[in-house]
C-alpha cells in the first residue's frame, strides 16, 4: 500500500513538472515611447495575437529590467531608408531577442503580421534568424460594390440613396473594422468602393 502511494506521488510530481515546463513564456513587446500610430497598431495586434495563442504579453518602451532569458520582440523603423522598398521589413532573431525593423510604419505592421502568421502556423516563438521582404505591387486592395441588383421604385438605373435604410451594412462600423483588419492580414493597403454612374437619369436625349 505504501509503495502504491509512493508511485502515485511520484506520478503527480512528474505531471506537475511537465505542466510547469509546458507553461508558455511571457513575451515583451518593446517599441519607442514616441512610436507612430502604425507602429502602435502593429504592437497592439501582435499582443492580441500572442494572447489569443496562450502567451502572456506586455508592451514596454525600453528593455530596462527585462531579464536576458525573457522573450523580447522589438519594433522599430529604419533610420536610413535610402534604397529600401516602401512597406518592406526585416526580421532578425538573436537568442530570445527578435527585432522587427520596418522601412516605414506599414513595414512594421507587415513584419508583425509575419510573426503572427508564424505563431499561428508553427505554434511556437522560433522566429526566423533573418528575413527580409517587401511588397512587389504598390497598390493592393479589395473592391466593394455599392449598388442594388434591382431598380428602386420611381428611380432609374443606378439611382439609389446611400441611406441606412437602403444600405444598412454600409453604416455598420464593427463590420468595417473587421473588413479592414482582414485587408491588413492579407497585406493590402487600399480599399475601392465601386458604384455605377446614374448617367442615364442625368442626361435627357431627344427621341
What are these regions, as identified by a protein language model?
Residues 1-25:
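Bacterial Sec-dependent N-terminal signal peptides
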Residues 3, 52, 56, 118-121:
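A structural signal for alpha-helix termini and helix-coil/disorder junctions
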Residues 8, 22-95, 126-129:
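Acidic, contiguous N-terminal accessory segments
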Residues 12, 40-41, 109:
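A broad detector of short, well-ordered amphipathic alpha-helices
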Residues 15-17, 22, 72, 112, ...:
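Generic recognition of cysteine residues
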Residues 34, 45, 49, 81-82, ...:
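Feature activates predominantly on carbohydrate-active enzymes
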Amino acid at each position: 500500500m505504501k509503495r502504491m502511494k509512493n508511485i502515485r506521488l511520484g506520478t503527480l510530481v512528474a505531471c506537475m513538472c511537465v505542466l510547469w515546463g509546458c507553461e508558455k513564456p511571457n513575451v515583451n513587446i518593446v517599441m519607442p515611447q514616441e512610436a507612430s500610430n502604425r507602429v502602435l497598431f502593429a504592437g497592439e495586434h501582435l499582443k492580441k495575437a500572442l494572447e489569443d495563442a496562450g502567451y502572456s504579453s506586455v508592451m514596454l518602451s525600453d528593455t530596462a529590467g527585462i531579464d536576458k532569458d525573457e522573450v523580447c520582440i522589438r519594433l522599430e523603423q529604419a533610420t536610413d531608408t535610402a534604397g529600401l522598398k516602401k512597406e518592406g521589413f526585416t526580421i532578425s532573431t538573436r537568442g530570445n531577442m527578435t527585432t522587427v525593423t520596418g522601412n516605414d510604419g506599414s513595414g512594421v505592421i507587415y513584419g508583425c503580421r509575419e510573426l503572427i502568421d508564424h505563431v499561428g502556423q508553427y505554434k511556437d516563438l522560433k522566429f526566423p534568424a533573418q528575413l527580409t521582404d517587401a511588397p512587389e505591387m504598390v497598390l493592393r486592395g479589395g473592391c466593394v460594390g455599392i449598388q442594388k441588383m434591382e431598380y428602386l421604385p420611381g428611380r432609374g438605373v443606378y439611382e439609389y440613396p446611400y441611406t441606412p435604410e437602403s444600405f444598412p451594412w454600409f453604416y455598420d462600423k464593427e463590420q468595417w473594422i473587421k473588413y479592414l483588419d482582414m485587408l491588413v492580414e492579407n497585406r493590402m493597403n487600399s480599399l475601392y468602393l465601386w458604384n455605377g454612374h446614374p448617367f442615364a437619369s442625368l442626361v435627357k436625349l431627344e427621341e
